[in-house]
């Protein structure tokens, strides 16, 4: 049982465990921190979210870790969260951000059985857009070091891994279409499909991204800015594609449905083209969808990672093993090529979200949160 003991301005866990509240370099954890907070519901991230300063650093409970975030991941669905679409019952203000990687700087007594101060961990949990985040030890993932490449696996990698394994029915020789293939999750869908010995087609928005896809083994990159996707699919794949990993929505979804082979499967993991609209949806030809699916005995199925959490740890372990061994490319985009340079600090998350919705990123967008040992934040 935890016993909180007041010590001046803040409380720490029982004095015998006070050492857990010093970071691994020996500097005291500050009393205040910065974090992003959703203060109004809106799909416009800048309107919805505020950088809040002088927030109290949270205390870990008995089974928790306090993680000092070094890198956090940006996801297309961050603006769905800021718009209140995932849980309409939650009202502002609330924390935002889905994933982070950093060091354990404090922990509860039960959590200390498995973790130590200074240990590198990655996690998928709400509230990562902060300098410090409390994470249940049961859902944290130990990692060899604090590398942004490991962070790419938490949401983007596991989404591709679990959805394709559970819903894709991949096997040698099947044709797989991956939309937004050079993005955060598309890069993994592309590589995992190739490892299953499939023929992979990947859509992207530039020649540079096309070259990136080729470097990963993509059989047919399609730069939709210079080639009409529908025409390419009809001419080069007249029998259709067996599996589609779809994250764009709108017109791209319609093209993907039309390209399905007999008994083809389309997995919807998102529809980014509609997220910034008031409804969060992009128009599709829903009226003709039943007839098209019936004609081909095809299927469309959604995938939401939270519904497959029982598969998460096994997927994460396998992906991490592949990443560490060099068997999986985990491309990170830290914004070095963006007009204002690298995404550094919580305030740069606003730029990072815009960068993503402009389609500029190659790989997973990651924001670095620098830390000075002597910083008082």
UniProtKB/Swiss-Prot annotation:
General function of this protein: Functions as 15-oxo-prostaglandin 13-reductase and acts on 15-keto-PGE1, 15-keto-PGE2, 15-keto-PGE1-alpha and 15-keto-PGE2-alpha with highest efficiency towards 15-keto-PGE2-alpha. Overexpression represses transcriptional activity of PPARG and inhibits adipocyte differentiation.
Entry similarity comment: Belongs to the zinc-containing alcohol dehydrogenase family. Quinone oxidoreductase subfamily.
Chain positions with Phosphoserine modification: 299
Keywords, sorted A to Z: Acetylation, Lipid metabolism, NADP, Oxidoreductase, Peroxisome, Phosphoprotein
Domain of life: Eukaryota
Organism taxonomic ancestry: Eukaryota, Metazoa, Chordata, Craniata, Vertebrata
Record-listed E.C. numbers: 1.3.1.48
Localization annotation: Peroxisome
Official protein name in the record: Prostaglandin reductase 3
Binding site for NADP(+): 185, 205, 209, 224, 247, 269, 275, 303-305, 361
Modification N6-acetyllysine, positions: 35
Keyword flag Cell cycle: no
Catalytic activity: 13,14-dihydro-15-oxo-prostaglandin E2 + NADP(+) = 15-oxoprostaglandin E2 + NADPH + H(+); 13,14-dihydro-15-oxo-prostaglandin E1 + NADP(+) = 15-oxoprostaglandin E1 + NADPH + H(+); 13,14-dihydro-15-oxo-PGF2alpha + NADP(+) = 15-oxoprostaglandin F2alpha + NADPH + H(+); 13,14-dihydro-15-oxo-prostaglandin F1alpha + NADP(+) = 15-oxoprostaglandin F1alpha + NADPH + H(+)
Any single GO BP term: lipid metabolic process
GO molecular function, one term: 15-oxoprostaglandin 13-oxidase [NAD(P)+] activity
GO cellular component: mitochondrion; peroxisome
Xref: Pfam families: ADH_N, ADH_zinc_N
């Amino acid at each position: 049982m935890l016993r909180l003991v007041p010590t001046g301005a803040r409380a720490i866990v029982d004095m015998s465990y006070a050492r857990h509240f010093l970071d691994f370099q020996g500097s005291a954890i500050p009393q205040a921190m910065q974090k992003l907070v959703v203060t109004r519901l809106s799909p416009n991230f800048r309107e919805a979210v505020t950088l809040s300063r002088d927030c109290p650093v949270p205390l870990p409970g008995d089974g928790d870790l306090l993680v000092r975030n070094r890198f956090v991941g940006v996801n297309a669905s961050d603006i769905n969260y800021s718009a209140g679409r995932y849980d309409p019952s939650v009202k502002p203000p609330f924390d935002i951000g889905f994933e982070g990687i950093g060091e354990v700087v404090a922990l509860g007594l039960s959590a200390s059985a498995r973790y130590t101060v200074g240990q590198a961990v990655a996690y998928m949990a709400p509230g990562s857009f902060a300098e410090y985040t409390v994470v249940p030890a049961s859902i944290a993932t130990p990692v060899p070091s604090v590398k942004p490449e490991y962070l790419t696996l938490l949401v983007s990698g596991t989404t591709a891994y679990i959805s394709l394994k559970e819903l894709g029915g991949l096997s040698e020789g099947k044709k797989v279409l991956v939309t937004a293939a050079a993005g955060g999750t598309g890069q993994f869908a592309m590589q995992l499909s190739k490892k299953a010995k499939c023929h992979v087609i990947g859509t992207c928005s530039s020649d540079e991204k096309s070259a990136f896809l080729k470097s990963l083994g993509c059989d047919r990159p399609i730069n939709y800015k210079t080639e009409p996707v529908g025409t390419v699919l009809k001419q080069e794949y007249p029998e259709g594609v067996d599996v589609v990993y779809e994250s764009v929505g709108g017109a791209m979804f319609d093209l993907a449905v039309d390209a399905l082979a007999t008994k083809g499967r389309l997995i919807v993991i998102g529809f980014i083209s509609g997220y910034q609209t008031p409804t969060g949806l992009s128009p599709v030809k829903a009226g003709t969808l039943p007839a098209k699916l019936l004609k081909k005995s095809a299927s469309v199925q959604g995938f939401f990672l939270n519904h497959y959490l029982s598969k998460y740890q096994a997927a994460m372990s396998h992906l991490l093993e592949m990443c560490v061994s060099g068997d999986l490319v985990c491309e990170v985009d830290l914004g070095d090529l963006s007009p204002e340079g690298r995404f550094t600090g919580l305030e740069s998350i606003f730029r990072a979200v815009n960068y993503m919705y402009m389609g500029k990123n190659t790989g997973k967008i990651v924001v670095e949160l620098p830390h000075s040992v002597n910083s008082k934040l």
